[in-house]
Design a protein with these regions (language model features):
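Short amphipathic alpha-helical surface patches that mediate protein-protein
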Residues: 60, 75-80, 91, 141, ...
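Amphipathic alpha-helical segments at domain termini/boundaries
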Residues: 67-125, 130
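Non-catalytic protein-protein interaction segments used by genome-maintenance enzymes to assemble
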Residues: 1-67, 71, 86-87, 91-96, ...
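Short, small/acidic-rich helices and loops at N termini and domain boundaries
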Residues: 48, 54, 63-66, 106-173
Length: 173
């Protein structure tokens, strides 16, 4: 989902709620690619899939250079896996009919882009945390040393607390 958002809306601006230096609520604008890349880098999160990781690195470098790649760059990329992924993610088999004639407003991805981007980043983080929790659980079961088990359980508790926070933000109980 994050790669699709980068391909489709990477160069678009979204509004993000934040606070200023006096802790007053503000809304600031940020480029979608910048929000996704910076947020994942800030938490030292990487994609497991090599193709996704390469795309992440391309966007990271492009942000440093100040020039974001266009969709065509990925569709015609020399790496066949990137080109295929781009073509698949950018082609949608669905098209909304013109509901305005019937006075029915249908929300598109663009209408809820800020929320979609934030939710997708949080879901990715939740998925990564879940994988790390599962690894720690396995290590706890395999470790015979009680002191090592306690250290692993403390790490798992921190991950559990992070997951609870993320799930709260996602509205998941």
């Amino acid at each position: 989902e994050l790669v699709k958002l980068l391909f489709t809306y990477g160069d678009r601006e979204i509004d993000i709620d934040g606070t200023d230096e006096n802790n007053n609520p503000i809304i600031y604008k940020i480029i979608v690619a910048s929000f996704i890349i910076d947020d994942l880098k800030n938490d030292d999160l990487l994609f497991k899939d090599e193709t996704h990781r390469i795309i992440f690195e391309i966007y990271d470098k492009a942000l440093d250079d100040g020039i974001l790649p266009k969709q065509q760059f990925f569709v015609s990329h020399e790496n066949a896996k990137i080109a295929e992924l781009a073509a698949n993610l950018l082609s949608s088999p669905y098209k909304l009919d013109n509901w305005e004639k019937k006075e029915i407003k249908v929300k598109t991805e663009e209408d809820v882009l800020s929320k979609l981007v934030i939710t997708s980043v949080l879901r990715f983080k939740d998925m990564v945390l879940d994988e790390k929790r599962n690894e720690l659980t396995k290590q706890i079961m395999e470790t015979e040393n009680i002191d090592d088990q306690i250290i692993l359980m403390v790490k798992k508790k921190r991950l559990d607390d992070l997951r609870i926070k993320i799930n709260h933000e996602l509205g998941i109980v």
